[in-house]
Amino acid sequence: MTNNVRGYLQLHPFHLVGPSPWPIFTSFSLMDLAFSIALNSHGYMANNFYIILSIITVLYSMTLWFKDIIAESTYLGDHTIAVKRGLNQGFLLFVVSEILIFASLFWAYLHSAVNPTMDLGMSWPPVGIDVISPAELPLLNTIILLASGVTITYAHHALINGNRANTLYGFIYSTLLIALFVMFQFLEYKYAGFTITDGVYGSTFYSLTGLHGLHMIMLTIMLVICTWRVYNYDFTNTSHVGAETTILYLHVLDVIWLFIYIIVYWWGS
């Protein structure tokens, strides 16, 4: 479908998208993944089979969900003004919920860090914890995330101005930077001197950084999809809701990481 025809079909203010099964399927898959991780952490599972199965179901549900969204917006012309408004409002509510989740985890961390008990040796970090230096991989990851914020902003401005080539380059660079961040985060976990079972410090540290890492993996998938859609001429300078939500998602995760770096890595060390 050409952009002119698609724009004509999207002018009226009616909601054309029908009910979708994928949101509820994705929600149950995520809940199953959370339960699997919790049970595995407490030793109720002998292996990681259910975690791997949950990850597969999450990715499968999200793949079909994204496929339907792309088909509805690009090929069917169902993303009218009302649909776009609903997508933007829904994503803003998602961002607010994510901020509240991270706020609760920061609260849990600071509750023990500000007033450590005798069980923690009256000190923070607790006695016996070999903390990760904030001047090593965490600092490098911070620089990488700030750089990704620059490249995605460059891509956003290029998209608004109708410069497809620079938009594509910006999304490619951003995708590579976020993937590099995830890889360095994995290396940090691999060589860390403590685990999630090492008391309140280990549990709050891995809960904060691990949840952020899961969101970064999700962001990588979204960036790959946006990069492909830019390459496939799916976005125009006036219609690019998927790109805008991905860009906002990246900036929100950038800000959350800055709080993690300052509070957990720098102040908490």
UniProtKB/Swiss-Prot annotation:
Function: Component of the cytochrome c oxidase, the last enzyme in the mitochondrial electron transport chain which drives oxidative phosphorylation. The respiratory chain contains 3 multisubunit complexes succinate dehydrogenase (complex II, CII), ubiquinol-cytochrome c oxidoreductase (cytochrome b-c1 complex, complex III, CIII) and cytochrome c oxidase (complex IV, CIV), that cooperate to transfer electrons derived from NADH and succinate to molecular oxygen, creating an electrochemical gradient over the inner membrane that drives transmembrane transport and the ATP synthase.
Subcellular location: Mitochondrion inner membrane
EC number of this enzyme: 7.1.1.9
UniProt keywords, alphabetically: Membrane, Mitochondrion, Mitochondrion inner membrane, Translocase, Transmembrane, Transmembrane helix
Reaction it catalyzes: 4 Fe(II)-[cytochrome c] + O2 + 8 H(+)(in) = 4 Fe(III)-[cytochrome c] + 2 H2O + 4 H(+)(out)
GO CC aspect terms: mitochondrial inner membrane; respiratory chain complex IV
Sequence similarity: Belongs to the cytochrome c oxidase subunit 3 family.
Gene3D superfamilies from the UniProt entry: 1.10.287.70, Cytochrome c oxidase, subunit III, four-helix bundle (1.20.120.80)
MF-aspect GO terms: cytochrome-c oxidase activity; ubiquinone binding
TM region positions: 7-29, 51-71, 90-110, 127-147, 167-187, 205-225, 247-267
Name of the molecule in the record: Cytochrome c oxidase subunit 3
Record text on subunit structure and interactions: Component of the cytochrome c oxidase (complex IV, CIV), a multisubunit enzyme composed of a catalytic core of 3 subunits and several supernumerary subunits. The complex exists as a monomer or a dimer and forms supercomplexes (SCs) in the inner mitochondrial membrane with ubiquinol-cytochrome c oxidoreductase (cytochrome b-c1 complex, complex III, CIII).
Keyword Transmembrane applies: yes
GO BP annotations, alphabetical order: mitochondrial electron transport, cytochrome c to oxygen
InterPro entries (alphabetical): Cyt_c/ubiquinol_Oxase_su3 (IPR024791), Cyt_c_oxase_su3_dom (IPR033945), Cyt_c_oxidase-like_su3 (IPR000298), Cyt_c_oxidase_su3-like_sf (IPR035973), Cyt_c_oxidase_su3_a-hlx (IPR013833)
Gene name for this UniProt entry: COX3
Protein's membrane topology: Multi-pass membrane protein
